[in-house]
């Protein structure tokens, strides 16, 4: 995995333009906890969601092959190897500032992007999280 080599990205993190964070704060305050809980619910019982995904893959017939067995394996592996896990603070979906800084350092070095003008706090926020939602 890429993370095994030091690039511990936040896979599929919700992104919002910084100019929109304040203006969409009410929406984000409602949406983010729903997304947190959905991840926990899926981790605890993926059967209904996996069934729907497999059904839609077949229905849309885009060439992607995804079986019920593959869905179950992906779910189980995600939990087993820590791809799906609470943040270092025990909250589902939280960002760790040191981890964000590490990602910024890698992007700066290898992508030639000047990240020195930004801080982890400017790049990611835990502002809209419900601290009570976790895998426990």
Predicted regions and their residues:
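Conserved C-terminal helix/tail region of periplasmic/extracytoplasmic solute-binding proteins
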Residues: 97-136
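A bilobed periplasmic-binding-protein/Venus flytrap-type ligand-binding module shared by bacterial periplasmic
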Residues: 11-26
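Residue-level signal for pocket-adjacent positions within structured domains
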Residues: 9, 16, 90, 118, ...
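Short beta-strand->loop
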Residues: 1-9
């Amino acid at each position: 995995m890429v993370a095994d080599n030091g690039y511990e990205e936040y896979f599929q993190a919700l992104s919002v333009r910084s100019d929109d964070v304040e203006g969409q704060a009410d929406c984000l305050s409602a949406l983010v906890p729903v997304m947190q809980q959905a991840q926990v619910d899926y981790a605890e019982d993926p059967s209904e969601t996996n069934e729907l995904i497999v059904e839609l893959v077949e229905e849309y017939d885009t060439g992607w092959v995804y079986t019920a067995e593959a869905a179950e394996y992906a779910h189980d592996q995600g939990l087993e190897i820590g791809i799906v896990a609470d943040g270092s603070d025990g909250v589902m979906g939280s960002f760790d500032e040191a981890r964000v800084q590490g990602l910024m350092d890698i992007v700066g070095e290898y992508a030639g992007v000047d990240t020195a003008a930004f801080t982890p706090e400017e790049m990611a926020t835990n502002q809209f999280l419900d601290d009570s939602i976790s895998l426990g």
